[in-house]
């Protein structure tokens, strides 16, 4: 089993290098450029640094967010990461915007974040597996069917899960790096594929910016159409989904019940919801955050490690010491403050654009 996993990593590393070239080309067309289609707000979703710095109203939101963080080092880091003209950025985009070399995509060892939740995939994009009493829910599925076969499938087996038990793949938004591997589980294991209606449309719509390799990739067949507030239940686990337009028209936010050290804990997962190019997307984002606060959430996850902190480093620590400190976890009071920080920082960008 280990030898198969190592072979899979080697194959995936080669594919990841090719995909890195593809992603760099996409990013070169602007931060709004999308693998699966056109991103909502592409090229207009953020204020310029000058707009941001010169807007008194925006800076008032920034100051309020800083006050909420108080003297808590963890919250101060989240404020520094979240407030700014571009908001939280993936490390690859941050490096690119700074004119630095972008680190290549590389496969990583699976890591258990909570008692019943794991991360698989690459250092820059991943899939999440949630074990329930009656099967597995996957969140996202990497870039391609090949990555699903050579990375996700062997990783599931490595942590003691059976890929045949995957009941759902819930896709956070309709870009290739999230839905690319979904057809593999749909075709081989008959897993249900869930995505918002607007993003099913995005997946099915021809993308004029796609290169030939992208254009010819398999796409999942339309299946479960997620609506606002929809719940998906497998066994003892019910995930609640909220539609948060911004990165795409139908980007999702998830409320996921997990267990941590034997106790229940609620996770908020954002799939692009931190991008709010207009008032409507800001209001939807705020509502999703309010739902998370009301649910007593204590952790924030997303598909791209590094978006909200040194998440790759936190994962490395959990690989070394699975029972050690878990930096993904907040107290309820901390997380409620983090929610308010995110709300103020998102509002600061919208008002800086004069919206």
Question: In which residue ranges do the predicted regions lie?
Answer:
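Positively charged n-region of N-terminal signal peptides that target proteins for export
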Residues: 1-5
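Bacterial N-terminal signal peptides
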Residues: 8-20
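Zn-dependent metallo-beta-lactamase
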Residues: 27-135, 145, 355
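Active-site HxH/HxHxD metal-binding segment of metal-dependent hydrolases
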Residues: 54-57, 67, 117, 146-150, ...
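Conserved beta-strand hairpin/beta-sheet module of binuclear metal-dependent hydrolase folds
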Residues: 103-159, 253-274
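Short, hydrophobic/aromatic-rich segments at coil-to-beta transitions
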Residues: 112-118, 229, 237-240
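Divalent metal-coordination and catalytic microenvironments
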Residues: 116, 130, 140, 173, ...
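Metallo-beta-lactamase
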Residues: 135-136, 143-145, 221-223, 231-233, ...
């Amino acid at each position: 089993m280990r030898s198969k996993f190592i072979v899979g990593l080697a194959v995936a590393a080669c594919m990841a290098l090719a995909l890195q070239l593809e992603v760099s080309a996409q990013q070169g067309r602007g931060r709004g450029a999308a693998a699966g289609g056109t991103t909502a707000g592409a090229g207009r979703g953020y204020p310029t640094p000058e707009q941001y710095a010169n807007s008194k109203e925006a800076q008032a939101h920034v100051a309020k967010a800083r006050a909420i963080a108080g003297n808590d080092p963890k919250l101060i880091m989240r404020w520094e990461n979240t407030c700014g003209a571009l908001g939280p950025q993936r490390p690859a985009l941050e490096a690119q915007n700074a004119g630095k070399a972008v680190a290549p995509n590389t496969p990583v060892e699976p890591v258990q974040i909570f008692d019943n939740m794991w991360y698989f995939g690459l250092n820059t994009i991943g899939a999440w597996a949630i074990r329930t009493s009656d099967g597995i829910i996957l969140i996202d599925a990497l870039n391609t069917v090949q990555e699903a076969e050579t990375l996700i499938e062997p990783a599931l087996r490595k942590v003691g899960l059976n890929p045949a038990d995957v009941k759902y793949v819930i896709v956070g938004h309709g870009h290739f790096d999230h839905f690319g591997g979904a057809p593999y589980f749909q075709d081989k294991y008959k897993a249900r594929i869930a995505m918002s209606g607007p993003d099913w449309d995005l997946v099915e719509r021809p993308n004029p910016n796609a290169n030939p390799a992208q254009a010819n990739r398999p796409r999942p067949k339309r299946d479960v159409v997620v609506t606002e507030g929809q719940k998906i239940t497998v066994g003892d686990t019910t995930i609640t989904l909220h539609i948060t337009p911004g990165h795409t028209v139908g980007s999702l936010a998830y409320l996921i019940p997990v267990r941590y050290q034997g106790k229940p804990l609620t996770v908020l997962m954002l799939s692009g919801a931190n991008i709010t190019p207009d008032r409507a997307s800001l209001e939807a984002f705020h509502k999703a955050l309010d739902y998370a606060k009301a649910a007593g959430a204590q952790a924030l996850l997303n598909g791209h490690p590094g978006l909200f902190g040194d998440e790759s480093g936190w994962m490395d620590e959990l690989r070394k010491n699975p029972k050690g400190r878990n930096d993904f976890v907040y107290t309820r009071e901390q997380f409620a403050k983090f929610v308010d920080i995110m709300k103020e920082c998102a509002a600061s960008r919208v008002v800086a654009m004069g919206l």
